[in-house]
Regions:
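Short glycine-biased active-site loop of nucleotidyltransferases that positions the nucleotide triphosphate
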Residues: 94-97
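Structured segments of extracytoplasmic/periplasmic soluble domains
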Residues: 57-65, 132-139
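A short acidic/small-residue loop/turn micro-motif
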Residues: 90-91
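N-terminal carbohydrate-binding/catalytic regions of secreted carbohydrate-active enzymes
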Residues: 46-57, 61, 86
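Basic/polar, cationic surfaces and motifs that engage anionic cell-wall
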Residues: 1-41, 45, 78-82, 87, ...
Length: 192
């Protein structure tokens, strides 16, 4: 977690209580400006690494949850192909209550063959995501790269099933894919 204690800062805004954090209304369609983007949030689709999860599958599932369309701004498939689903300053539907101050990026996978949370990111996904986050950091230099599970006040889950801070630090500094996999796993082979 980033911080479990209140008061806390979300971006540059002081939040006095969990109630204040959770009751913020996301009533606008667009964020105010690039300065509104405080977080670049990495997600996983929470699908098995041996299961194909197409854009159409993602759209169907998000609409079934009541979203008007896919809630993420970007979706990266196992082969490294990427699709864009929201304009950059359009409010997403991926990490409530942070949707009005974040960009959501999802990679296909996140579960092993048995359905357990696991870093299943392929080399192609890692490369594409690194390029995307580099470009997003240029557009939003104040934004912090975080995993969904790192945001206090969101639904407790393992998403994105890896240590996002370590992955981002390694990838944005140009480490090899194998080194990144080692960084994101504990010595016992489980997620950090």
């Amino acid at each position: 977690m980033i911080n479990d204690y209140f008061p806390m800062e979300v971006g540059e805004e002081k939040v006095r209580s969990e109630r204040m954090l959770l009751t913020k209304v996301e009533d606008g369609k667009y964020m105010m400006s690039a300065d509104s983007v405080k977080f670049l949030v990495l997600h996983c689709s929470a699908t098995r690494c041996n299961q194909d999860y197409s854009v159409e599958d993602l759209r169907r599932d998000h609409k079934a949850r009541g979203f008007r369309d896919i809630g993420y701004h970007f979706y990266v498939r196992r082969d490294g192909s990427m699709t864009k689903h929201r304009r950059l300053l359009e409010v997403g539907a991926h990490a409530r209550p942070y949707n009005r101050c974040s960009i959501g990026v999802c990679y296909e996978g996140g579960l092993d063959e048995n359905g357990k949370p696991c870093n299943t990111m392929t080399k192609e996904q890692s490369n594409r995501l690194a390029d995307l986050f580099r470009n997003l950091r240029i557009a939003f230099p104040k934004a912090k790269i975080v995993g969904h599970r790192d945001l206090p006040g969101t639904t407790p889950k393992e998403c994105p099933c890896l240590d996002t801070a370590e992955w981002a630090k390694a990838r944005l500094l140009g480490c090899s894919f194998q080194r990144i996999v080692r960084i994101c796993l504990r010595k016992d082979g489980n997620l950090k």
